Amino acid sequence: MVDEIIVSGPVIIKQGKLRVIKEDKDDFYKLPGGRVEKDETLEETCAREIKEEIGGEIIILEKLSTLILSENPTTHKKMRIELHHYLAELKNPLEINPIEPIKEIKWLSLDQIKRKKYVVSPNIRYLLEQGDLK
């Protein structure tokens, strides 16, 4: 039987740039987010994860595309990962403090992501293809 997890996270875009994080274990940029806990909605997970990872609070604006992966992009372990994305904005953009294991929080230009200047997670590429990142 294949392991299965459901993940939810915010997509924060401002002035043509995407808010991303990089963890110690990763060699790519990714969106904040994480596993849905028992009795938690996808939206609640989204808000909790951003607070845990960068110390900020968000306002969820709309649901974006969902991506199903068959492999963990970090460990390459075969598993089913259901990634739910929500367009969101930070309530107070100045209150950003990375929390371990987050080693970097950055704004990446969508144009540079499209031109593959950065190594990013599969869901960022997917959201670009779906037209969700504008």
Language-model segment annotations:
Residues 27-29, 95-134:
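Nudix hydrolase/Nudix homology domain
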Residues 36, 67, 90, 110-113:
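Hydrophobic pocket-lining residues within nucleotide cofactor-binding pockets
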Residues 57-66:
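A short coil-to-beta-strand element that immediately follows conserved catalytic motifs
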Residues 68-95, 106:
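Active-site-adjacent beta-strand/loop module that shapes the phosphate/pyrophosphate-binding cleft
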